[in-house]
Amino acid sequence: MNNQPSVLFVCVGNGGKSQMAAALAKKHAGDALKVYSAGTKPGTKLNQQSLDSIAEVGADMSQGFPKGIDQELIKRVDRVVILGAEAQLEMPIDANGILQRWVTDEPSERGIEGMERMRLVRDDIDARVQNLVAELTQNA
């Protein structure tokens, strides 16, 4: 039996925040954590500013692509993290894991745009990811 903890990061388009969280989790956890990402309404490509901001901190999401929700995966993972307030997801009744929502910083509400905005979003997600990785891997 595989006791490796697992997490699924979810946002609407799976082109930005959930991909960023997955890349950061892989960077911090390495092989100690199985990491997945998906979107409730997947887009067609990754957000270029997300890619660039993740690369700045030594993580890589360049091989990612927007994907939809896999109901079987949701049932198996230890944690499902919804990023932002927009994505809506209900856990299947027979799911094993815990659902949580991260209402992430949205600098555009303060008039901050472009790469400055994306770096702030990345740093907020990164702090949350580091805490989650520590929590999920402490007993693995």
From Swiss-Prot:
Identification of the protein by name: Arsenate-mycothiol transferase ArsC1
Keywords assigned by UniProt, alphabetized: Arsenical resistance, Cytoplasm, Transferase
GO molecular-function terms, A-Z: mycothiol-arsenate ligase activity
Location(s), subcellular: Cytoplasm
GO biological process, one term: response to arsenic-containing substance
Enzyme nomenclature, EC number: 2.8.4.2
Similarity comment text for this entry: Belongs to the low molecular weight phosphotyrosine protein phosphatase family.
Catalytic activity, as annotated: mycothiol + arsenate = arseno-mycothiol + H2O
Function according to Swiss-Prot or TrEMBL: Involved in defense against toxic arsenate. Involved in the mycothiol/myoredoxin redox pathway which uses a mycothioltransferase mechanism; facilitates adduct formation between arsenate and mycothiol.
Induction entry: By arsenite.
Enzyme class: transferase
Record organism: Corynebacterium glutamicum (strain ATCC 13032 / DSM 20300 / JCM 1318 / BCRC 11384 / CCUG 27702 / LMG 3730 / NBRC 12168 / NCIMB 10025 / NRRL B-2784 / 534)
Pfam families from the UniProt entry: LMWPc
Gene Ontology annotations for the cellular component aspect, listed alphabetically: cytoplasm
